Amino acid sequence: NKERVYERACEIVDETTKDMVAGVAYHWYSGDHFETLQMVREDFPELMLMRSEGCVEYARGKEHVQDDMRHARMYAHDLIGDLNHGMNSWLDWNLVLDEQGGPNHVGNFCNAPVMCDTVTDTVEYKPMFHVIGQFGRYIRPGAVRVGCSSFSPEVEVTAAQNPDGSVAVVI
């Protein structure tokens, strides 16, 4: 998980292995820990930082309570924080799930950006889908993050300069 990504990079990357390690992957489940990404970025600038898994799990044994806007805010917060601290790529674990939040072999059913109801044969695009879309639509492949700031900690923001010279700001 993210809180140990710096420690793990220090353990894995040395003079012998530095040419064999292209990046480090992490998950988001233990909290923000954005400062650990910044530490990896500063001490290992050549490494890719890859958020390789994240999802919003339903509480086990409880009715599937969906707070779609809260989940969308969680995604936006994580994407902005990770980008602002050196992340190179971000992957969701479950982009598309069924109406139960599965299928899943261990019973940890999840909410997802796209939910397909196999009973009614309908597709629902959740707010998480649109949050992910805001980043992918405006921050293009090959973009470089540029500095930005916010007047309030309640307004999170990131910015990047795209290869065509345009600047994308995502709030």
Locations of regions flagged by a protein language model:
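Active-site neighborhood of glycoside hydrolase catalytic domains
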Residues: N1-A59
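Short, solvent-exposed polar/charged micro-motifs at secondary-structure junctions
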Residues: R4-R8, G102, E154-T158
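Carbohydrate-binding surface patches
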Residues: R137, C148-I171
